[in-house]
Amino acid sequence: MIVNKPPMGWNTWNTFMEDIDEEKVKASADALAASGLDKAGYNYLVIDDGWSEKRRDSNGRLVPDKKRFPNGMKSLSDYVHSKGLKFGMYSDVGNWTCALYPGSYQFEYIDAQTFAEWGVDFLKYDYGNKPMGTHGKLLYRRMGAALATCGRDILFSACSWGTDETHEWIKTTGAHMWRSTHDLFNSWESLNDIARSQVALQPYNGQGCFNDMDMLIVGLHDTKLPGDGCNDTEYKTHFALWCVLGSPLM
């Protein structure tokens, strides 16, 4: 799978955080399609952390939260696809995700196969709770290899936080985009700092594997995100900088 331009779409985290469910995802898919943003290339709808049960099933498989996703992920994936969109999900390199749901450490192949069976098109793979003494390069290579053999094209988003000299090895993992920064907070100071930090990393950005400057915060005046927010001019500048620097727009 070759990715020729920075992926674009929408991720649930900055709006809903862990408070996500089937109806909210369907409503978001409806809104993306009705707005025409999909026609402009915003075609990925990605569910972030917090979607699963707290334990795997007896076969070691991830299980969607039964109360919040009563019809399962394949049904939800089919709904998103019916709107002309692509369906994305979240996991983590560790035993646990950042929000303490089951991660994919040592379950990479079974999880990749599960995601393929659910019709997943995009995997955000976070860096929280990384096992001590295990290098990120190995962890991302494991999932990259698992996705390469799962029988489905799944865009691999390595959310590696820009640590551990990721730029030097990320293209050996099969990732199509990689987090080249720490988390973006909802403030002018944070987005300005991140934009400036990316200048030296531009040689690593391009077709096949794009530098991800974190999810957009445009228009998020009233959210639970850290930071005091921005004014509209600052949000517009934020969007322009992400475009100029070739970041995915999610």
Region locations from a protein language model:
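Second-shell loop/turn segments in exported
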Residues: 12-20, 64-66, 101, 130, ...
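Glycan-recognition surfaces
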Residues: 107-110, 149-250
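Extracytoplasmic, non-cytosolic globular domains
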Residues: 122, 128-154, 161-162
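Active-site beta-loop-alpha junctions enriched in small/polar residues
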Residues: 13-15, 50, 92-96, 128-130, ...
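Aromatic-lined carbohydrate-binding/catalytic grooves of carbohydrate-active enzymes
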Residues: 28-132
